[in-house]
Structures are given as structure tokens and as C-alpha cells.
From Swiss-Prot:
Subunit (UniProt): Homotetramer.
Reaction it catalyzes: a primary nitroalkane + O2 + H2O = an aldehyde + nitrite + H2O2 + H(+); a secondary nitroalkane + O2 + H2O = a ketone + nitrite + H2O2 + H(+)
InterPro entries: Acyl-CoA_Oxase/DH_mid-dom_sf, AcylCo_DH-like_C, AcylCo_DH/oxidase_C, AcylCoA_DH/ox_N, AcylCoA_DH/ox_N_sf, AcylCoA_DH/oxidase_NM_dom_sf
Gene3D superfamilies, A to Z: Acyl-CoA dehydrogenase/oxidase, N-terminal domain, Butyryl-CoA Dehydrogenase, subunit A, domain 2, Butyryl-CoA Dehydrogenase, subunit A, domain 3
UniProt protein name: Nitroalkane oxidase
UniProtKB keywords: FAD, Flavoprotein, Nucleotide-binding, Oxidoreductase
Domain of life: Eukaryota
Activity vs pH: Optimally active at alkaline pHs.
Entry EC no(s): 1.7.3.1
Coiled coil: none
Annotated FAD binding sites: 132-135, 140-142, 170-172, 301, 311, 372-376, 397-401
Cofactor(s) listed in the protein's UniProt record: FAD
Source organism (scientific name): Podospora anserina (strain S / ATCC MYA-4624 / DSM 980 / FGSC 10383) (Pleurage anserina)
Length: 430
């Protein structure tokens, strides 16, 4: 395709809808949840009306593939939506987008027999939450290397039921609005029906089981527990607690991915979300730049001219603008490549990983650069700068940490004998 950064009619529509959503729905949500103490679970619960309004507006249905009855568009359109929302109110936005991540394994792997699980998210009613329940308290970065024990959350087949036991952490939305379980959890776990044999690849035991709120209610009190609500410096209206499943029984029909197929689908979900984390980074960089630019035009720090006329300030600010443009270009290229190529899946995936790593780390640097430019006034909580940094700092370490997971995946791609560094740009040639 020719290189053209003009938005299509559909992309312009996405941008306009995202702009309206961010300013008219998400921004007021911030004023609501800030009325509650920092890191209080009430902050998350107070955003339920906002979430319900987003559902009514079709945002959840837009995160489901048309193949499954949704109205989902392209990955570039998703990136436009995420960037716009993150430039205005990232915390309330993450709850919405985390449901999209929770539904991604179904988008990737569901068959007709799984339609019932998607029904609540296609209705446009209520405030259903979905969650990709992946991370564990002890970490999972090395859990699937050969010789490792694999996931500590297990599922054992007993008759026509799977019995789930284990603890999970950081899975956004997994506890639901009342902290008794979300509407749909894609639980990534290890098949423990038979033991992992010495030398066996732990990936061969990874499966994904769908656990609904009805399943948890049927299992009764104590089957699902919130052990701790995690206090975080940013995204303070988001819920991603430490939870425990105890002898949760679900029917065999709830298996989305049997043992041996779960890891591929879970990592496939994170390949798509890598691009969207890139867009999150761009949104935060935008917000940091805009706030610093406004400050520089209005403030002179006791001098004779506005700060923007000072070379030191202008150099820092122009650097942030340049990095923001570069980050967006990489994000859009990765989004386009994931769905259109060129190159094989590994080449496309490399761009998604690069977008996640580059944009997340650039966002942190952008926030610190504008803080250095603004000076001590940036430390005032009435200004947005410290909040932007507290939000940005999680991007390199969540959704697959850059050091422990994302850069290791890049390393694995480069180690392959078939690695072609530039096929995602020029295609493959003999």
C-alpha cells in the first residue's frame, strides 16, 4: 500500500467518536472517583456508571470481532481510540480496554459453541466485565521455560468437570464490580490432570478455561476470594487484585483452549495488546506535551519572556514532540502490519513488540522531561505532571514487562535461523 497518513473516513469517525467519549464520558468519571480516598476500592466501583454508558455506546461490542457478532474495526482504529482516551483519562479508560483484552482469547479461538459466553458483551446493556487472568503473585516471566514447573494455577479433570485452584494477581477487572468475580474470566492455567514429566515443555500443559460469574456463584462462598486490593501510584480507579480460586468446578464446555494450545492463544492476545500499549504511551506523551506547552506559553518564571522563548525549555519540549510523533508512527505501522503484513507472523509480531517497548519507555521519559522543563511547579498535585508520570511508569512493566518478557520475545525472534530483520517493511525475497 502507498504510504499515506491521511485518516480514512472510517478512521476519522473513530477519532471523532473517541474524542467525544474521552471528553464527555471519561473526563467526568475522573472527578467522580477522585472524591474517594486514593486506592480505595470505591474508586473503581464509582466508575461503573461511566462503564455502563460506554457499553450502551457500543464500545464493548466494538472490541469483539465481526466473526463473533461484534462490530470491531481495524487495529489502527483501536489504536486511535486508545490514544485519544489515554490523552484525557487513562484510569477509567483502562477498565474498558481491559475487558477488550479479556475478550481477545475468544476473538482468537472461540467456536460456535462459545457464543453463550459472548452474549452479555454483545447486548449493549449493563456493565459486564471480562478479564484475561494470566499473571500470578510469584510472576510468570520464566514459568514456561523448559525445566520450570509452569503456571501455579491448575485445573484438574474430574469426570465432566474441570476443578481450578490457585492464585492470580494484576488481572484487571477479574473481581467484578462487587469483588465476587467478573462476568467472564479467561483463566490461563496448567492442566494438572497428569503431572508434568521431567523434560516436558510446560507450554504443553497450558490451557485457557472460561469462568463465568454464574460458575462462581454456583460453586458457593469461598470458591473465589479477593485476598488483597493492590495499591498503585497510577491508574487509581482500576481493579487488579490478588485473588484465589479454590476448587472452582466448571463444565468441560468451558474449555476455550485445551492443554497445549493455551499459551499460543494467550501470547497472541498480548501481541495485539502490545500495539495498544504503544497507543497508551502516545496518549500520555500527548498529554504531557500539551500541558507543558500551555505552561510554557503562560508562565515566565519571573523573567521578561514566556518560558517557551527559553532555549533549554524549548529543546526539552521539542524532543518530547519528536518522540511522540515517532511513537505514533511506529504504533500505526505495527497495527497495520499485524493485520496486513508484509512479512510472516514473526515479522509482524516483532513490530508489535517494538511498539510496546519503545512507546512505553518513551512515555516515561517524556513525562520526566516535561517535569524537568517545568521545574518544581510540576510537583504540585494541582498540575497534571506527577499524575502523568505515575500513570506512565507502569507501561514498561505491565502487559508483559519489557525486561522479563517483551525484550526476551524480541531476542527469541532474532535467534531464529529464519529471522529476516526487514521483511515487515519490504516483504520477503529469496
Amino acid at each position: 500500500m502507498p504510504i499515506d497518513f491521511h485518516l480514512s473516513a472510517s478512521q476519522k469517525g473513530t477519532y471523532q467518536a473517541a474524542r467525544s467519549l474521552a471528553r464527555n464520558l471519561l473526563m467526568p468519571a475522573r472527578q467522580t472517583y477522585l472524591q474517594h480516598p486514593p486506592n480505595s476500592p470505591l474508586r473503581f466501583q464509582s466508575t461503573q456508571p461511566t462503564y455502563a454508558a460506554a457499553v450502551s455506546a457500543g464500545i464493548l461490542k466494538g472490541q469483539i470481532s465481526p466473526a463473533h457478532g461484534g462490530t470491531g474495526g481495524t487495529l489502527i482504529e483501536s489504536a486511535i481510540l486508545v490514544e485519544e482516551c489515554y490523552s484525557v483519562e487513562p484510569s477509567a479508560a483502562l477498565t474498558i480496554f481491559a475487558t477488550g483484552l479479556g475478550l481477545t482469547p475468544i476473538n482468537l479461538a472461540a467456536g460456535p459453541q462459545h457464543a453463550e459466553f459472548l452474549a452479555p458483551f454483545l447486548s449493549g446493556e449493563g456493565s459486564p466485565l471480562a478479564s484475561l487472568v494470566f499473571s500470578e503473585p510469584g510472576g510468570v516471566a520464566n514459568a514456561l521455560e523448559k525445566g520450570a514447573p509452569g503456571f501455579q494455577t491448575t485445573a484438574r479433570l474430574e469426570g465432566d468437570e474441570w476443578v481450578i485452584n490457585g492464585e492470580k494477581m494484576w488481572a484487571t477487572n477479574c473481581a467484578g464490580w462487587d469483588f465476587k468475580g467478573c462476568d467472564l474470566a479467561c483463566v490461563v492455567c496448567r492442566d494438572a490432570t497428569t503431572p508434568l514429566e521431567e523434560g516436558q515443555d510446560p507450554e504443553n500443559k497450558v490451557m485457557i478455561i472460561l469462568v463465568t460469574r454464574a460458575d462462581l456463584d454456583r460453586n458457593g462462598e469461598g470458591s473465589f476470594e479477593v485476598l488483597r486490593h493492590v495499591a498503585t501510584p497510577g491508574h487509581t480507579s482500576v481493579s487488579g487484585p490478588h485473588v484465589r480460586y479454590t476448587n472452582v468446578r466448571v463444565p468441560t464446555k468451558n474449555v476455550l483452549c485445551p492443554a497445549g494450545q493455551g499459551a499460543k492463544v494467550a501470547f497472541g492476545a498480548f501481541d495485539g495488546s502490545a500495539v495498544l500499549v504503544g497507543a497508551m504511551g502516545v496518549g500520555l506523551m500527548r498529554a504531557a506535551f500539551d500541558a507543558a506547552l500551555k505552561f510554557a506559553k503562560e508562565d515566565n518564571r519571573g523573567g521578561a519572556v514566556p518560558l517557551l522563548e527559553r532555549q533549554a525549555f524549548a529543546d526539552l519540549l521539542s524532543g518530547v514532540k519528536i518522540q511522540t510523533e515517532a511513537a505514533r508512527a511506529l504504533t500505526w505501522k505495527a497495527a497495520h502490519a499485524m493485520e496486513n503484513g508484509p512479512g510472516d507472523y514473526d515479522a509482524r509480531r516483532e513490530l508489535a513488540l517494538a511498539a510496546k517497548v519503545f512507546c512505553s519507555e518513551a512515555a516515561v521519559k517524556a513525562c520526566t522531561d516535561v517535569i524537568n522543563a517545568v521545574g518544581i511547579s510540576a510537583y504540585d498535585l494541582q498540575r497534571p505532571f506527577s499524575d502523568l508520570l505515575n500513570t506512565a511508569v507502569v507501561l514498561p512493566i505491565f502487559d508483559g514487562g519489557n525486561v522479563g518478557i517483551r525484550r526476551r520475545h524480541l531476542q527469541q525472534l532474532m535467534l531464529k535461523p529464519t529471522y529476516d530483520a526487514w521483511s515487515s517493511t519490504y516483504g520477503s525475497f529469496p
